[in-house]
């Protein structure tokens, strides 16, 4: 109740905070997007005249030679807030997802997710719920298992740029919490700070800053209780023009990653990347990546 009153006090509407999984996402994107080390990857997105979206993805691991692929079809029935999704991958796993949003209550999304593997006969089911409004973002998922369901819950509160979140998982088969995470952060238009504690033993933090319209930077830091090793990394992304950008990152293990993304034409994007081991430049072991995205 106190949260609701606090949200009504300002004259201007407060922003909806991100979900717990999206806390610190801007910094993670600078570290992860624009790279594809050790992979040759092709992504194709198309949309039919009837509104059905098709997404096909295929990748080959240059080290192992293993090829993975997936196909996803999605249809949105906007009038009723419904989304139907069918998935398949090369592990021969079939998935079906039905989501309904903003129909039962504004800001509430319910998702029914099932998977089935014909090869093994393994089945899984999950019910997901998410509710968001000014200052508040809640989530609760129930993952069904023969041994007993697992309940995943999360909550994020936001006020004047400050964010506080909690995430938990309760395993009913073991009758105990198997995940217990806390997070605190601060977010403005061009600056974000995020810190988290996972299970009381893993600590992490990240900083994201948009220095200019063309330059974005990020820093991350992580360590584990009882260990003297600290993981540290810095990354940056620079837009050369409206069609091209370069990315670079380095961590305390002397691993240097570089990436180049070029939009060749509308709907065609090429990504080149390389990972260099700074400790053994002459010994080899470096990785290259090639990605092509097609959208029509």
Swiss-Prot record:
Binding site for ATP: 25, 33
Family from the record: Belongs to the eukaryotic mitochondrial porin family.
Protein name listed in UniProt: Non-selective voltage-gated ion channel VDAC2
GO BP terms: binding of sperm to zona pellucida; mitochondrial outer membrane permeabilization; mitochondrial transmembrane transport; monoatomic anion transport
GO molecular function: ATP binding; ceramide binding; cholesterol binding; oxysterol binding; phosphatidylcholine binding; phospholipid scramblase activity; porin activity; voltage-gated monoatomic anion channel activity
Subunit and partners: Monomer, homodimer and higher order oligomers; formation of higher order structures is necessary for scramblase activity.
Site feature Involved in ceramide and phosphatidylcholine binding. Critical for channel structural stability and gating, where: 86
Top-rank taxon: Eukaryota
Keywords from the named record: Acetylation, ATP-binding, Ion transport, Isopeptide bond, Lipid transport, Lipid-binding, Membrane, Mitochondrion, Mitochondrion outer membrane, NAD, Nucleotide-binding, Phosphoprotein, Porin, Transmembrane, Transmembrane beta strand, Transport, Ubl conjugation
Keyword RNA-binding attributed: no
Organism in which the protein naturally occurs: Meleagris gallopavo
Sites of N6-succinyllysine modification: 33
